[in-house]
Amino acid sequence: MRGSELSLLLLALVLCQAPRGPAAPVSTGAGGGTVLAKMYPRGSHWAVGHLMGKKSTDESPSLYAADRDGLKEQLRGYVRWEEAARDLLDLLEAAGNQSHQPPQHPPLSLQPTWDPEDGSYFNDVQTAKLVDSLLQVLKEKGGTAS
């Protein structure tokens, strides 16, 4: 046991005699800067990537006010387009609902009867001739059957 205590005591004395100071040597170079400044010429290494692309807030406040007004106007335009699209969808939906409903016809008892002798229903001459020929065929079949 005595040997292990002696080795611990010697280790403590050696450690106490070691120079105390920063982990990296702080020596000034020829330009007056420290060695760390030469290692990281752009400043503290943790903030270099973090602050890239950042701008000062007090550079030009008038530009930010102009941007804010432009953004408000752009937002108003988007709102107008959204309202117009919503109105269009409502109209399309209403038109779609109407197209799915059957057409409204008056009851059969109120509809006028068709007179085969009356040619007012046929404005086209060819259609009238076709109907006349069909009527003749039907009359012939009716005459032979009786």
From Swiss-Prot:
Name the Gene Ontology molecular function terms of this record: neuropeptide hormone activity
One GO cellular-component annotation of the UniProt record comes to: extracellular space
Q: Where is the composition biased (Low complexity)?
A: 94-112
Question: Which effects follow disruption of this gene?
Answer: Contrary to wild-type, mutant mice do not display imitative scratching after observing spontaneous scratching behavior in another mouse.
Principal place where this protein is found?
Answer: secreted
Q: GO biological process annotations for this chain's record?
A: mast cell degranulation; negative regulation of voltage-gated potassium channel activity; negative regulation of voltage-gated sodium channel activity; neuropeptide signaling pathway; positive regulation of behavioral fear response; positive regulation of peptide hormone secretion; positive regulation of phospholipase C-activating G protein-coupled receptor signaling pathway; positive regulation of respiratory gaseous exchange
Tissue specificity here reads:
Detected in peptidergic dorsal root ganglion neurons (at protein level). Expressed in several dozen neurons throughout the dorsal retrotrapezoid nucleus/parafacial respiratory group (RTN/pFRG) as well as in scattered cells in the nucleus tractus solitarius and parabrachial nucleus (at protein level). Within the RTN/pFRG, expressed in neuronal subpopulations distinct from those expressing Nmb (at protein level). Expressed in L6 corticothalamic neurons (at protein level).
One Pfam annotation, family name? Bombesin
Q: Where can this protein be found?
A: Secreted; Cytoplasmic vesicle, Secretory vesicle lumen; Cell projection, Neuron projection
The lineage's top-level taxon is: Eukaryota
Sequence positions bearing Methionine amide: 52
- Residues that make up the propeptide removed upon maturation: 56-146
Q: Which PROSITE patterns match?
A: BOMBESIN (PS00257)
Q: Which UniProt keywords apply?
A: Amidation, Cell projection, Cleavage on pair of basic residues, Cytoplasmic vesicle, Mast cell degranulation, Secreted, Signal
Annotated region (Disordered) at: 94-121
Q: Report the leader peptide range.
A: 1-23
The entry's family comment says: Belongs to the bombesin/neuromedin-B/ranatensin family.
Function of this protein?
Stimulates the release of gastrin and other gastrointestinal hormones. Contributes to the perception of prurient stimuli and to the transmission of itch signals in the spinal cord that promote scratching behavior. Contributes primarily to nonhistaminergic itch sensation. In one study, shown to act in the amygdala as part of an inhibitory network which inhibits memory specifically related to learned fear.
Please report the name of this protein according to its UniProt entry. Answer: Gastrin-releasing peptide
Species assigned in the record: Mus musculus
